[in-house]
Amino acid sequence: MAILISPSNNTGWGLGTHKLFGGAKQKSDQHPVYVQAHYRAPWGGKGRRRPGRARGVPLDPKTEAEVVATIDEVARNGPPAARLVLEAARRVGAYNLRRARKLTPAGRAMAAMRARQMVNQAKRRKRRVRSK
């Protein structure tokens, strides 16, 4: 149910059950509240708009020695905790963790490249076996 809250000139503001609607684009004596600033679109209301561009976070600079030490540690103790892996994946841009765990375009490209490499390796192996 909506309640109409109206100034004397009846230009109309409305209060819905969950939101304010209608009203002023500019604050004035007739409209002391800038209603559009209080309006909240319903879920999915921005679905067809172009999404904002996420700024890539650069990877932490690592020296070769640090990388080697990390590899050795993983070899000794097993893979790091999943949270750390996801954090690294987010920094690389493979996953967009604000939404569902779907691959981002960068992650999709990386996965496609890896798949192509695997197919090409299999083809090369097949050729080597035939030529022998």
From Swiss-Prot:
GO biological process annotation, one example: viral penetration into host nucleus
UniProt keyword annotation of Ribosomal protein present: no
InterPro entries named among the record's database cross-references: Adeno_VII
Factors inducing expression: Expressed in the late phase of the viral replicative cycle.
Propeptide intervals in chain numbering: 2-23
Annotated positions for site Cleavage: 23-24
Annotated Gene Ontology cellular component terms: host cell; host cell nucleolus; viral capsid
Secretion signal span: none
Motif (Nuclear localization signal): 124-132
Further comment: All late proteins expressed from the major late promoter are produced by alternative splicing and alternative polyadenylation of the same gene giving rise to non-overlapping ORFs. A leader sequence is present in the N-terminus of all these mRNAs and is recognized by the viral shutoff protein to provide expression although conventional translation via ribosome scanning from the cap has been shut off in the host cell.
Family label: Belongs to the adenoviridae histone-like nucleoprotein family.
Free-text function comment from the UniProt entry: Plays a role in the inhibition of host immune response within the nucleus. Interacts with cellular nucleosomes and immobilizes the host immune danger signal HMGB1 on chromatin. In turn, prevents HMGB1 release out of the cell and thus decreases inflammation. Also plays a role in the wrapping and condensation of the viral DNA. May also promote viral genome import into the nucleus.
The protein's assembly and partners: Interacts with the core-capsid bridging protein; this interaction bridges the virus core to the capsid. Interacts with host NPM1; this interaction might play a role in placing the pre-histone-like nucleoprotein on the viral DNA or regulating viral gene expression. Interacts with host HMGB1; this interaction inhibits host immune response.
Protein name per its UniProtKB record: Pre-histone-like nucleoprotein
Gene designation per UniProt: L2
